[in-house]
Amino acid sequence: MATITASSSASLVARASLVHNSRVGVSSSPILGLPSMTKRSKVTCSIENKPSTTETTTTTNKSMGASLLAAAAAATISNPAMALVDERMSTEGTGLPFGLSNNLLGWILFGVFGLIWALYFVYASGLEEDEESGLSL
């Protein structure tokens, strides 16, 4: 059995939401009652071109070589990932072509393709070829 109780905390929350706290850079939005950020009209972008020195180049090359060495060591030491395949997982990640876990599914796929091809062949052979048909070169 569910009961509903009323308390005065709801009115406190309502009163707290009506209190207006003005913050620097924030103006109140009269539409939704939500604060909106004030817009600053000036945006300054700058770029500096620092000449590369040989010290930074050698440091970059050393760090690149160290990271490549660490990646190669991790790749050679780690074992290949083996998947635990359960019947509930079907054929995901097992490497079977087209995800066919049963030979009957392959024959069904081949039969549907053959049926569609045969129906198209019968349909196309009944078309009359004239200059405007687009079937002849």
UniProtKB/Swiss-Prot annotation:
Q: Would I find rRNA-binding among this entry's keywords?
A: no
Q: Does the keyword Thylakoid apply?
A: yes
The principal location of this protein is plastid
Q: Which residues form the signal peptide?
A: none
Keywords of the record, alphabetical order, are: Chloroplast, Membrane, Photosynthesis, Photosystem II, Plastid, Thylakoid, Transit peptide, Transmembrane, Transmembrane helix
Give the protein's biological function.
Answer: Stabilizes dimeric photosystem II (PSII). In its absence no dimeric PSII accumulates and there is a reduction of monomeric PSII.
The family line of this record is: Belongs to the psbW family.
* Record's protein name: Photosystem II reaction center W protein, chloroplastic
Q: Which organism is it from?
A: Spinacia oleracea
In the UniProt record, the gene name given for this protein reads: psbW
